[in-house]
Each structure stands twice: as structure tokens, then as C-alpha cells.
Amino acid sequence: MTQSVCILGVTGSIGQSTLKILGQHPDKYSVFAVSAHSRISELVEICKQFRPKVVVVPEQKIAELKTLFAQQNISAIDVLAGQEGLVDIASHTDVDIVMAAIVGAAGLLPTLAAVKAGKRVLLANKEALVMSGEIMMQAARDHQALLLPVDSEHNAIFQSLPHNYLQADRTGQPQLGVSKILLTASGGPFLNHSLEQLVHVTPQKACKHPNWSMGQKISVDSATLMNKGLELIEACHLFSISEHFVTVVVHPQSIIHSMVQYVDGSTLAQMGNPDMCTPIAHALAWPERLQTNVPALDLFEYSQLNFQAPDTQKFPALNLARQAMRAGGLAPTILNAANEIAVEAFLMERIGFTSIPQVVEHTLEKLENTAAESIECILDKDKVARSVAQQYIKYWRLK
């Protein structure tokens, strides 16, 4: 019997890699529902091949989608709109597995809906957990959802931890013999740039990652090291560990995806070629394994693997994220919201590359940090933080 899959963000890089794996295993998985934000022509091609029962797009894209469906003689697919539609498919009774791959805060509510519906949730949307933190993790426990990490680093940590680690008490301290998590980072395309060179970075250059094929937003986050900062926060929540037990290690080759150190001196690492199909396949089938077309790692190709500490002077975003996690409450929500606005402004060439962390720092300083008591207060703070960041950028440009 096949398992039914819902893919939130099907036209993005994670969504495409997920389809690749599902297409290789039609005897195990079927696509029940998908969502897309803007690439409607690509969505139609996906629907022709995988024939989902339900599709969700923004309200303003429904007419375009239905026109293309009619032209391609595609029928028997329900079309839903907006956040309500996303929540509906993520929590649908016919869905077994939800791939949460919507980028940014927009993925929070549908991801939480999937968790509250007790689904197997493959978490690629790190921002959802950065914002909701323990609310999301408590919901997973209350509703017996299986929350499995898809980010290569968190998937590597998951594979390197004791098999029952997620069932251990959530104390913020390492459990079951674990002493530390080593979160690896490629360092991004500007690892060896000077501060002066970073001032002149363009969006085109920032979107060219040396090792991974990714969307624009995550590529820029990787270049600023904010992506690693968000992943640090995600790791703290997923594995219930305080931020000072998580060390970021720059590893330019992206072969070791992360490591776990133990009290007996052991260090366990998960290694592999940088291909998102590997962690996706792992999360889909865990505790079993799926065949993929990812080549096995050839160790003879690598004469050496390099490691170094991150330069937080050149890349202050990492420390901003660590400070937000340390502060707790709504600070991570403020951090994430301001970063999304700043990255969007950079991609539109409204601010420079080195201005991104400055916008984030200003917004964190401007807003009061209070307890994250509910999803409603998280969403309210997200909205306010975006407004503050936008106003700061607007003022900056007028100076």
C-alpha cells in the first residue's frame, strides 16, 4: 500500500528533489496534494505527471491555473487558495506525509497544522520552527506527530544521535552520552572575501552557492551565514539543547554534513555528496532506507577535508541568531522577519549585502522581546518586525 504525500512548495528546489525521489518509488508513494506560489506553468507540468487530487495556489493565481488546466485537458483536480488551502491539504485525513518546504514565515501555519494532525512532517522550512520553537515541539508531542529534519545538517545530526534521542527529556542539556553538536557550514561563496569585497557583492553573485543548488532566499542566507544562524536555532529546538552546546564549524567541501560529539571522546559524523535527495529519502523512509540515484561518496577523490571557525566579524548574522536564541521569547521571530525583509530588499538591489545584518540588528534593538505565548502573538510580532525593518530600509534609502 502506498503512502500519500502532500508537498508544500512543490516548485522549489526541495519540492523538485522530493518529486524526483517519489518518481523513483511509485510503488511506495503517491502525490495527494501540492502547493506553489508563483511558477504556475511548472506546476501544471507537475500535475500532468503526478496527478495530485488537490492543488493550492495564491488567490490571484487561480484564474491562470484553471486556464492552463483547461488548455492541457487536466481535470479532476481540486484547486484551493491561500493559507486556508495550505492548512487544509497539510492536515487532510488522506495525507500520510507532509513535506514542509515553503520558504519563510508563510510556511508556519500549514506546518503547524500538519503537526497537529499527527502527520509525518518532513521539515525543510526552518523558519517555521525558528518562529514557533517549543510551541511546535509541544504540539508534535501532544498529537504524536513525527517531525523529521530535512535540512542536510539536521538530518545528519539526527542520524548521528542515539536512535531514541528525540524521546529523551527536553531539558536543554545534552542527553544519553551526547556532549556537543557540531553544526557544519560551507562558509558560502564569500568565505575568503575581505570586508571591503563584501560591500560590493551583487545579488547575482550571492545566489551562486559553491556546493548546493538552492533558491534565492536560502542562497543569500547562506552567503551571510544567517542560514547557519537559523539552523542553530532550529537545532536547539529539534534536539532540545542549549545554544552553547552547539558549535558552528566551517567545512568548505560540504562532505561532512554535521557531527555529534560524545562524552567518551567519540565524534560521529554523517558524510555524503551534497545532494538534497539523500536527506529527503532518509526522512521519507526512516527508519528504513530508500534507493536513490545519488552517487556514493568516493573518499579517494578528496585529498583532505578542511575545517575552520566562522569569522563573525565579516559575517555578524551568525552571532545575531545566537543572541536571539539566547534571549528566547519572540527574539527569533523578530530576527527571522527582519532578515526576510532585508534579503528581499537586497535581491531588489535596494540595499547592499553588508546592510542585511544591519537591518536585522536594528529591528532586534528597536522591538521589545516578550514571551512567545501563542501562535497569534508570534504572528503579530512577525508583522510588526517586518514593518520596522521596511521603515528602516526606507529611511536608509532616503538619507
Swiss-Prot record:
Q: Does the keyword Metal-binding apply?
A: yes
Query: What does the record give as EC number?
Result: 1.1.1.267
Keyword Oxidoreductase tagged: yes
Instruction: Tell me the pathway.
Output: Isoprenoid biosynthesis; isopentenyl diphosphate biosynthesis via DXP pathway; isopentenyl diphosphate from 1-deoxy-D-xylulose 5-phosphate: step 1/6
- Which UniProt keywords are given for this protein, alphabetically ordered? Isoprene biosynthesis, Manganese, Metal-binding, NADP, Oxidoreductase
Output the HAMAP family linked to this UniProt entry.
Answer: DXP_reductoisom
The UniProt similarity line reads: Belongs to the DXR family.
Protein name per its UniProtKB record: 1-deoxy-D-xylulose 5-phosphate reductoisomerase
At the highest ranks, the source species' classification is:
Bacteria, Pseudomonadati, Pseudomonadota, Gammaproteobacteria, Moraxellales
